[in-house]
Regions:
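N-terminal small-domain helix-loop-helix segment of the aminotransferase-like
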Residues: 1-58, 65
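Conserved PLP-anchoring active-site segment centered on the Schiff-base-forming lysine
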Residues: 69-91
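Short beta->alpha connector loops at strand-helix junctions that form conserved
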Residues: 81, 100-106
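A short helix-loop-beta submotif of the ANL/AMP-binding
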Residues: 93-99
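Active-site phosphate-binding strand-loop segment of PLP-dependent enzymes
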Residues: 105-174
Length: 175
C-alpha cells in the first residue's frame, strides 16, 4: 500500500534538514513535557518530573550506562532466561557476570517467572542489579500486573536495583 506523506511531516523534515548539525541535540522542555504527558496518559504515572528523565540513544546504550553507574566489572547481574541477546552482549562487553533465572512454562505453555529461583539466585550471588524486560524479549510474554509486583517485591527484599526495559510496552493491546 502506497500513499503520500502528510504535508506537515514533509515540512518537519525540511526544517530539520536546514539545521546545520544532525548529531546530538539538547532536549527541550517540549521533549520532556511530551514524555511526562504520555506516561500519565498511557501508564497512569503521576509526579514524573523533567529531572527524573534521562536521555539515551537506545535501550542497549541505556543498559550499558546503567550497568556502569550501578555495578562494577565482575559483579553478577540477574536476567531471565531465555534472554535477549542484546542484553547478553552488553553484559559481556561491560565485564559483568550473567546469572540466569530460568522462565518456566506452566501447564498451558505460558512462560512464568520463578520467584523462588530469583530470590535464591539474588541471595547466593549477592546480586544487587537485575535486568527486567516487559514485555519479555524474546518470548513475547506480557507480564500481568500481579506478576510484575511479585517480581519487584523479590527485588526490593534483596535491595536490588532494576533496569526495566519497557521499550515495546506501547504496543501492548487490551485482552
Amino acid at each position: 500500500m502506497n500513499f503520500p506523506t502528510v504535508p506537515a511531516i514533509q515540512k518537519s523534515f525540511q526544517e530539520r534538514e536546514a539545521h546545520p548539525a544532525f548529531g546530538y541535540f539538547d532536549p527541550t522542555d517540549e521533549y520532556f513535557d511530551s514524555i511526562i504527558r504520555w506516561q500519565e496518559k498511557r501508564n497512569g504515572v503521576t509526579g514524573l518530573t523533567k529531572e527524573a528523565i534521562g536521555y539515551e540513544n537506545g535501550v542497549l546504550g541505556c543498559v550499558s550506562s546503567a550497568l556502569q553507574a550501578f555495578s562494577a566489572p565482575g559483579e553478577a547481574i540477574l536476567v531471565h532466561s531465555p534472554t535477549y541477546i542484546g542484553f547478553t552482549h552488553v553484559l559481556e562487553e561491560n565485564g559483568r557476570k550473567i546469572v540466569h533465572s530460568q522462565l518456566k512454562r506452566d501447564e498451558r505453555g505460558i512462560w512464568r517467572m520463578d520467584y523462588e529461583d530469583m530470590d535464591r539466585r539474588l541471595k547466593e550471588n549477592r546480586i544487587h542489579l537485575a535486568i527486567f524486560c516487559s514485555p519479555h524479549n524474546p518470548c513475547g510474554r506480557v507480564w500481568q500486573r500481579e506478576e510484575i509486583e511479585a517480581a519487584m517485591e523479590v527485588y526490593r527484599k534483596n535491595d536490588c536495583i532494576v533496569i526495566s526495559d519497557e521499550i515495546w510496552s506501547d504496543l501492548i493491546l487490551e485482552g
